[in-house]
Amino acid sequence: MVAATASVTTVDGVYPSPHFEGAEKRIEIDFHANETNARGLREVTRAQLDECMAAAHCEIVSVRSNAKFDAYVLSESSLFVFPTKLVLKTCGTTNLLAGVPTILKYASQVGMESRRVKFTRSSFDKPDLQPKLHASFDDETVFLEEHFGHLSPGGGSSYILGSKLKGVQWHLYVSGSACQWQDAQPKASLEVCMTHLNREHCEKHFYRKEETFVSSAQTTTDSGIRSIFEDFAIDDYVFEPCGYSMNGLNKLSATDSQFSTIHITPEDGFSYASCELSNVDV
């Protein structure tokens, strides 16, 4: 993940360290299956996906695919494209929601219509640095209602979980009628978000080419991540000057839609890590 520098001036001329927002915004859009287009969203071209990501203020740096889906490592987190599902997860000051209209446009061009959406994020460390669409959860909800409110009778639902006085809160917006997916195979997801990371472990995720850095694959092994996801084909990336991202595709079955993804912001003072395992059969 690429660090972002905020332009800040102070009275005494002392400048704070650049801040990077590790907390991710995540949107998961399910689409109706198209009987005449089995590949569905996977028919959206790379150039079109690049345009979608540019609108969200990020870019694709790597891709790995199997029979079920395509997994993209982004400059800020990850994108997963299935025939009937798209998962976009971005951190920093990316403008995730700004990419939604372009995503829906190209989905429509390949005959795909949305049926359900789920948007989630935790509290931002520096909300004042976020783009206008993400300035507040109210702003995000207004945008989501405009684009997905019609999927539920009476509109979508938004929730804020946890107490603001006790720290981090979890923000959730969902829209889509339950009857639209009640016959689908149930899936489970686990997402763990962490702050105040161990400094010694964070050192493994700095790109120091002249000192200890060998390769992204070696970083994945040395950090212990590979041992956690031994059954996954891992696409990993270490950023300059620091930061780490990986996508994992379950390699035990070529037809498995299960994926994992990890993103680490190692800088002291605003360190952050997230680990997600999704599409696990229940």
Listing of model-derived features with the role each one plays in the protein:
Residues 1-282:
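Polybasic/polar functional segments that serve as interface/processing modules
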